[in-house]
Amino acid sequence: MSSDRHTPTKDPPDHPSSSSNHHKQPLPPQPQQPLSRYESQKRRDWNTFVQYLKSQNPPLMMSQFDYTHVLSFLRYLDQFGKTKVHHQACVFFGQPDPPGPCTCPLKQAWGSLDALIGRLRAAYEEHGGGSPDTNPFANGSIRVHLREVRESQAKARGIPYRKKKRRKTKNEVVVVKKDVANSSTPNQSFT
């Protein structure tokens, strides 16, 4: 037997040695993967919404809010917006590039609100909010509000909203061709 081999010794329970496993030191926290930009923004948005609920008089619990509180949150956010939205009475109403300043308010852009609702909808479900059917962020009134905001901002700014067409990728075309090729019988010929 070699002398450099260490044989474990039994220590009495009241005198543990430094090599024993009686007192496990906590492992240092494992470095977490940094959150993606989307996940970081979703967490920030959720925390902002929760803080908004707590600031209400009386403060609201997560189980107490509904779509009306979501709508009031969206209106509250307008004060921090950076998009000029002209009133109908403004001389620059409907002009995309007004030649001068006006006193019309800055509001949240429709696209920002739409993305925010998407992130909050996902965050609500992640925080145990229940089924997508009961998600206040997915309520039809929220969709109607967003549509109205989009249309009014498009008119006020003179920039019509056009839905971007989705391009088909090569893979989609190949799949379609494969489906057509696979649907024919082996004995059939195309002439």
UniProtKB/Swiss-Prot annotation:
It comes from Arabidopsis thaliana. The keyword Transcription applies. Residues 37-165 form the ALOG domain. A motif (Nuclear localization signal) lies at residues 163-167. Residues 160-169 have a biased composition (Basic residues). GO terms for molecular function: DNA binding. One of its GO terms (biological process) is post-embryonic plant morphogenesis. It is found in: Nucleus. This is Protein LIGHT-DEPENDENT SHORT HYPOCOTYLS 9. Residues 181-191 have a biased composition (Polar residues).
